[in-house]
Amino acid sequence: MKAIKIAIDGPASSGKSTVAKIIAKNLGYTYLDTGAMYRSATYIALTHGYTGKEVALILEELEKNPISFKKAKDGSQLVFLGDEDVTLAIRQNDVTNNVSWVSALPEIREELVHQQRRIAQAGGIIMDGRDIGTVVLPDAELKIFLVASVEERAERRYKENLEKGIESDFETLKEEIAARDYKDSHRKVSPLKAAEDALIFDTTGVSIDGVVQFIQEKAEKIVDMS
């Protein structure tokens, strides 16, 4: 059976990572969390106090402490920078609020996209992000673009933060998500937009299982036809 490449794009908190992980597990595919890679680069910048003018230093740190993914005993995915487990650190609000400017740096995107394409070559992979279908994997057999209202996405992020023990204010989250949408869709390098051949799916009011079922059915149909 042919193993395909699946690209899932969409704005912040549209449910990309959640459904991508479930589908990867169901299909026996590899899940590559591209967002975690950009968050890791952002974590480096914030930890060292680097600005956009010091991109060479961020890249140097990435080379010294490469990003890797490992599985925890419970099957969840852990993110490492070198030997440091940054799984929780890269989900903190300061990283979330700064990832847009770091991910907009051409040199950072070039390096991480190169790594992502190399990993995806063999197929049987599912990636989620903001430019997977348009830039990273333009040859992906299945491209999905998930959308949802700002209100719904803020609610998801609020619940997610509660589960992780991260304090947050709902109204502030709404403002941050709206601001992130604007930054991501107006940046010069790889702006957030659906690929021309992507299936656009509004997840507002749709359960996780409903989104998973929709994408899996599309994937299985492509595999059956190949």
Swiss-Prot record:
CDD domains: CMPK
GO biological-process terms attached to the record: nucleobase-containing small molecule interconversion; pyrimidine nucleotide metabolic process
GO cellular component, one term: cytosol
InterPro entries: Cytidylate_kin, Cytidylate_kinase_dom, P-loop_NTPase
Annotated keywords: ATP-binding, Cytoplasm, Kinase, Nucleotide-binding, Transferase
Binding of ATP, residues: G10, P11, A12, S13, S14, G15, K16, S17, T18
Signal sequence range: none
An example Gene Ontology molecular-function term: dCMP kinase activity
Compartments, record wording: Cytoplasm
Protein EC: 2.7.4.25
Record's catalysed reaction(s): CMP + ATP = CDP + ADP; dCMP + ATP = dCDP + ADP
NCBIfam families attached to this UniProt entry: cmk
Family: Belongs to the cytidylate kinase family. Type 1 subfamily.
Protein name: Cytidylate kinase
Gene: cmk
